[in-house]
Amino acid sequence: MESQMPFNEKIDYGLHALVILAQYHNVAVNPEEVKHKFDLDGKGLDLVAWLLAAKSLELKMKRVKKSIERLPFIHLPALIWRDDGQHVILMKIDTQTNRYLIFDLEERNPKVLSAAEFHEIFQGGMILITSRASIMGQLAKFDFTWFIPAVIKYRKIFVETIIVSIFLQLFALITPLFFQVVMDKVLVHRGFSTLNVITVALSVVVIFEIVLSGLRTYIFSHSTSRIDVELGAKLFRHLLALPISYFENRRVGDTVARVRELDQIRNFLTGQALTSVLDLLFSFIFFAVMWYYSPKLTIVILLSLPCYIAWSIFISPILRRRLDEKFARNADNQSFLVESVSAIDTIKALAVTPQMTNIWDKQLASYVSADFRVTVLATIGQQGVQLIQKTVMIINLWLGAHLVISGDLSIGQLITFNMLSGQVIAPVVRLAQLWQDFQQVGISITRLGDVLNSPTENYQGKLSLPEIFGDIAFKHIRFRYKPDAPIILDDVNLSVKQGEVIGIVGRSGSGKSTLTKLLQRFYIPENGQVLIDGHDLALADPNWLRRQIGVVLQDNVLLNRSIRDNIALTDPSMSMERVIYAAKLAGAHDFISELREGYNTIVGELGAGLSGGQRQRIAIARALVNNPRILIFDEATSALDYESEHIIMQNMQKICHGRTVIIIAHRLSTVKNADRIIVMEKGHIVEQGKHNQLLENENGLYYYLNQLQSN
């Protein structure tokens, strides 16, 4: 191992780099603990200590020397070092613009460098780093190999399918032989008794062939249906386990389009393509028999096979590009459709139906055009296969007739050979014609792989602690949503005592909601710690945490179920008494009781059957029903009418009793009775105190906001 890699001994950039890289790989790390264990002399992590610390976190490392031309092919992020010994993390490379996104640990900011600028700081040495979970994820990558364990799991059924296929091929081999006997023996010698025997035998063979063919289809469909169920269940579980950042970085329609690719895989598994592969594997037996009849005619058949393969190889890349384009256009349509249906109130209110229709027509035309190009190319591919097949048939007819005339082959043998060649060519032709399906399912697996190969929230090795009490601490929090995004929170320090009611106010974009997202462990801060009862949330099980936090947002989603089911969503077996108690606490019981079906009333999709105030009160009841020790109101009343807000505020004292409550609001009247009010501006806490105390500072932001709202 090289030893000349410089690590700055005065400023501990090594620890900071380790924390960032570990968090990127969803590995929880406590910086203070790492420093305590490995920074024994207090001078910062040197190279050996850094490697030992990374190993203790089960991170896999590899020190390499790379030329700048090879960098686009390595797995990022990676740690590189500069001439002055200060660490730099290479985050991303844009090969089109030849620019490099780095994270400067000294300035704690991302930078975009040109190739020349990056070349000045890059000496060729770097540390590639990944986690064991990432390695296991790569080994379990979803692609065609995913189906191998499934085949092994159902190997008994597939063995039965192969056995049935063997018998079917034997029957397919016997039938042409019967025809040869009829042509060369029965017709020549006028053997009616032999004809009767052959007819009965052929009838028996046909019956068995039909029964076995149906049995094979049933067995195969049964096994593929099981695989389909496993894949569908795995897909949905994995989708819900993905971190919230996955969904925030993708359009809803794009995700829906990827999930719908499961239909393509389902059609492929239950179709005739795989049985055609089995039939093709048994073609070697037919080739042996055909060679026995006529080596010359068999050579013609064999020479046609490379033509099928070459034609498929020629068509495949063009077809794949057009299928990719078709998928992209379909994803655009899905996204626009979801967006339009979700925003139908706005579309109608603004009377922009013509504009939206115009956009849809253009996108639909693009999709139809892409689909048409796929269809045309697929048709060309199929006709090319037909051309090869017909050409081989003509050559065999001409050559076979010459062999019969010369006495090298009988008429019965020629007919038998053509029937056998049909058994060989048929699965080849079917596979060639189904090549579009192979291409489509390959693209579908790639699209699904974007979902199934994305890392889920890491629960393994996380702490499931006892019931929380509600002490909260944010220590030196620094956070941004993406490495190249602006800083949202910068060196935020905040302590909240158990049972304290905190109000957080500030301008839009000041970082108020981001604080609560960190508290729910939707994200891990770039720097600093979020603590509950002294426990670092980076080390905690997210499910354990979220079960003990109640959250009410400005736009809460209700499922298309009964009111009771929505309130008791986390525990369907919950007693009715608990549901009613939570509803009373949220001020929802009275209006629920006035409904014809009461708590059994179906709320409609997204709660469309209720008013905004009613939906909000049900959402509050849902947040309270588990008696959470921490309660978050994130603009929970900003969109309500004054009557609905008044009902909720009347019950606020009961709601907050015995809990730690964080209220984020733009209306200062919502938080003026809080124990403490936090004022945020551009990712910093600029003021804090009680309502009256903050009003005393006429130069403060809180006073300014209060004056605006008062006026």
From Swiss-Prot:
Miscellaneous note of the record: The sequence shown is that of serotype 2.
Protein name: Toxin RTX-III translocation ATP-binding protein
SMART domains recorded: AAA
Organism: Actinobacillus pleuropneumoniae
Keywords: ATP-binding, Cell membrane, Cytolysis, Membrane, Nucleotide-binding, Transmembrane, Transmembrane helix, Transport
Taxonomic lineage of the native organism: Bacteria, Pseudomonadati, Pseudomonadota, Gammaproteobacteria, Pasteurellales
Membrane topology listed for this record: Multi-pass membrane protein
Function according to Swiss-Prot or TrEMBL: Involved in the transport of the toxin RTX-III.
Localization: Cell membrane
Annotated ranges, domain ABC transmembrane type-1: 158-440
Record family assignment: Belongs to the ABC transporter superfamily. Protein-1 exporter (TC 3.A.1.109) family.
